[in-house]
Each structure stands twice: as C-alpha cells, then as structure tokens.
Amino acid sequence: MNLGLAIFLIIIALLVGAVAGFYGARAYMKKYFKENPPISEDMIVAMMSQMGQKPSNKKVHQVMNMMKHQQK
C-alpha cells in the first residue's frame, strides 16, 4: 500500500510540475517579447528603404502597432 501511494504521489508531482513549468515559461516568454520585440523601428525603416519605399514616421508607427496587435 505504501509503495502504491508513493508512486501515485510521484506521478501527481511530475504532472503538476510539468503544467506549472509550461505556464511559467509561457508567461516569461510573453513578458520577454513584450519588453524586447523581435523587430525594432530601425529595422522597419531599413526594410522599407530596401523595398524602395520612403519610410515616414506614420508608416513606421503603423507597422509597429500592427505587429504589437498581432502578438496579443
């Protein structure tokens, strides 16, 4: 009986740890990408210049807002 209870508790502890680890890592990554977006305004300006567009502040801010909205 003691062995069965010990195995059961170990399995439950592993499952709880896996779920907690998943949600903890997910929250950390969301916070990280919010603070450090994968693309910056300078990168957008360079990309628009390479495509032959004249990067105005309005266009750059529109693209940044679209990217922030997609991350949510």
From Swiss-Prot:
<dbReference type="Pfam" id="PF03672">
    <property type="entry name" value="UPF0154"/>
</dbReference>
<keyword id="KW-0472">Membrane</keyword>
<keyword id="KW-1133">Transmembrane helix</keyword>
<keyword id="KW-0812">Transmembrane</keyword>
<dbReference type="GO" id="GO:0005886">
    <property type="term" value="C:plasma membrane"/>
</dbReference>
<protein>
    <recommendedName>
        <fullName>UPF0154 protein lhv_1362</fullName>
    </recommendedName>
</protein>
<dbReference type="InterPro" id="IPR005359">
    <property type="entry name" value="UPF0154"/>
</dbReference>
<keyword id="KW-1003">Cell membrane</keyword>
<feature type="transmembrane region" description="Helical">
    <location>
        <begin position="3"/>
        <end position="23"/>
    </location>
</feature>
<comment type="similarity">
    <text>Belongs to the UPF0154 family.</text>
</comment>
